[in-house]
Amino acid sequence: MIRIFKRLPGVIFMVLLLGLAGKEALSHQRTYSPVEKRELQTRPEISITKVLDGRFQKKYESYLRDQFPGRDHWVSFQTDMELFMGKNEIHNVYIGKNHYLLEHYTEKEFDPQQISKNLQALEKFVGKAKQNADVHVMMVPTKSWILREKLPAFAPHYKEQKFYDALQQKLEKEDVLISVEPVLDAHKEEEIYYRTDHHWTTLGAWYAYEQYTKAVGGDLQRAQGKKKFRCISKDFYGTTYAKINYARQADKIEIYESADKLRVVYNMGEKKTKTLYDFSFLKTADQYSVFTGGNQAVLEITGGIKNGKTLLLIKDSFANSILPFLAEDYEKLVVVDLRQLNVSGDRLLEMFSPTDILILYNSAQFAQDKEFEIKCN
């Protein structure tokens, strides 16, 4: 009897594994994990060339991991076990105070060589663009840097100030930098970043928008009147959650609804709408894509104030939630994601003849963005 009880956990485990394997065998391959928010490796095609150079073996290993029976459940189970053992860092994500999930950044993400190349390209592009436009640069700090007091005790983390010092030194002569670190730091006790996602919230974006308005000499009273949001979701689980399939508290998504009648053209005529929001994404695991329907190559937005100004915004996903604020302040707003568009910075200046330019990136994403180095050099 004792032997039976000793073997029981192993028997149960094998039964569960075989059951999951059987279920998976009867189902189709998955191409996307809504939990991890990423594409999954499907069964790779075999060829002699791919076997000899090792590409097939590498992809097949990824295929086995990604198509493992009940993968989403195992990711969650692994996280629970590591938490039970007292770990506070899982898959480069810290379990922080007040239920914040904070990414562990290192010099891998802030590679000095890539940063140097990107800053060189940024300085060169700003120098050209300033000849015909009013140019500003805004780098948004990571959540882990602004909320570093919420990190576990003695948790190692990248000292992001090194990046800002290099940025300041490179752009000091140009006088184009809008530093949002101080204002975000001043409001860090407010919900300026999502708990389960690496992006800032609409509130965090609004504080940055207020700083931008001050820098360009805009209507500050009008900008402050936009600090009114509507909650559209209370069950948002973001990218950081997806890495470990764990969260103690869901996020809410709030939006600013423009008083102006906007007209939005997607990707040079691919689609036309009257809003910067795609509410269909609220029914999916990728709720953050409610902002502009995800990252688009080009957005052309009109319907704002009639002042003859065109703002060219070169950005990453952090800018998606600031667009509704900016759209009202310009006769035309052109939004470009260089990661999605095979066009150089010089060509953008020729195509849209902007009167104003804002380059807005999250610091970690800018540090890793090789597309910026290539297209703005």
Role assignments for model-derived ranges:
Residues 1-377:
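Extracellular glycan-modifying ectodomains
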